[in-house]
A protein has these predicted regions:
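Residue-level structural signal for beta-strand termini and adjacent loop
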Residues: 76-77, 113
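Bacterial signal peptide processing site
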Residues: 21-24
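C-terminal motif of bacterial Sec signal peptides marking the signal peptidase cleavage site
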Residues: 16-19
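Short proline/glycine- and basic residue-enriched helix-capping loop/turn segments at helix->loop/beta transitions
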Residues: 28-64, 88-135
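A short acidic/small-residue loop/turn micro-motif
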Residues: 78-83
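Bacterial N-terminal signal peptides that target proteins for export
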Residues: 1-11
Length: 137
């Protein structure tokens, strides 16, 4: 009785595999998508004239990160109101590096918005005194 049960079970399994589309060939697994990740994002150079004047702001940039993980397009999405801060933000982001997002195991470009904050220093930088002397002198 047991051999007959095993034979019937094996036959049912084979029929079930064929019915489910199992042909014995394996299908390559689909790679899970990954998201864009920042790798190297050094801060921007703060324009000394604005730092000395205590002027800050936020420049929000629209950045296209290419498949190599580097910014390929950088534009100002929302200005800080200070062109020098916006330009400093653009220059900084131009040198940033990312790990590109992937879809189906392949890197893809992605567009993101990046806020770059400029907060004036608590204490006046030493360079400010040199600028003051140049202006007076």
């Amino acid at each position: 009785m047991k051999p007959l049960f095993l034979l019937a079970s094996s036959s049912l399994l084979a029929v079930a595999l064929v019915a489910c589309g199992g042909s014995g060939t394996s299908v390559a697994p689909v790679a899970a998508p990954t998201e864009l990740a920042a790798v190297h994002t050094p801060p921007p150079d703060y324009p000394i004239e604005l730092a000395c004047a205590g002027i800050g702001g936020v420049s929000t940039l629209k950045v296209v990160v290419g498949i190599e993980g580097i910014p390929t397009e950088i534009g100002v999405f929302k200005s800080s109101g200070q062109p020098a801060l916006d330009e400093a933000a653009r220059k900084a982001v131009h040198g940033w590096q990312f790990k590109a997002a992937t879809r189906n195991g392949q890197p893809v470009s992605q567009t993101i918005q990046v806020p770059v904050n400029f907060t004036p220093p608590q204490e006046r930088p030493n360079q400010c005194f040199a600028l003051d002397s140049q202006r007076q002198g």
